[in-house]
Amino acid sequence: MTWMECFEKYGYYSLLNYETDDIEPEMEFFLENGEIPNQLREIYLSKYRDELFLILQPDRDENVKKFCQRWDNNIMAFIKFGSLPDDNRESIKKLRYNIVQVILYGIGENINGVKYMNEPDDFSEEKSTSVSRKIFIKSNDADE
C-alpha cells in the first residue's frame, strides 16, 4: 500500500492539486515563490480537521535538521496567520498541536523521478516537538 492510499483509506484529504499546480489559498505559507516546492509531496487534512500532515521529501544530500527547521518556520507562520480552507482562524486552535512532518527517505527515486534522500545518520529530529512532530518513513520507487 502506498502512503497516499493509506491517508485516503483513513479519511484524510489532499490540499494540493498537482494537475493545476494549485494549493488551497489558505495554505500559501507552504509555497516558494508562489509555487509548490519540489520537497512538498502532499498536504493531508483529517476529515475532522484536527490533524495536518505535510509529506516532505528532502533533497538527496540535504541537512535533515536544517530542512525540518525550515518547514517548522513555515508551519509557525501558518499557525500564526493562516486558516484552513473554508474556515476561519478558530480551526487553527485544535490543529495547532497536531501538525506532523512526514519525512520520506530511501534508495532510488519516487514515482515522479525525484531522488530520495539517503537514510539520515541522525534521527534525533524525530524526537523534536519544537513546532511540529516529525516522522521518518522509508519509501521506494513505488511510494510504498
Spans of features found by a protein language model:
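Short acidic, S/G/P-rich loop/turn micro-motifs used as interaction or catalytic elements
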Residues: 58-66, 106-115, 141-143
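Generic structural hydrophobic/aromatic packing signal, biased to beta-strands
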Residues: 55, 99-103, 136
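Catalytic micro-motifs at enzyme active sites that drive phosphoryl/nucleotidyl and oxygen chemistry
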Residues: 41-43, 86-92, 118-125
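A broadly used, surface-exposed interaction patch
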Residues: 47-97
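Charged, structured surface patches that assemble and position nucleic-acid processing machinery
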Residues: 37-39, 121-144
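Elongated alpha-helical scaffolds
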Residues: 94-112
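"Short basic amphipathic alpha-helical interaction patches in structured regions
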Residues: 67-73, 113-127
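Extended, compositionally biased accessory segments flanking or bridging domains
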Residues: 1-64
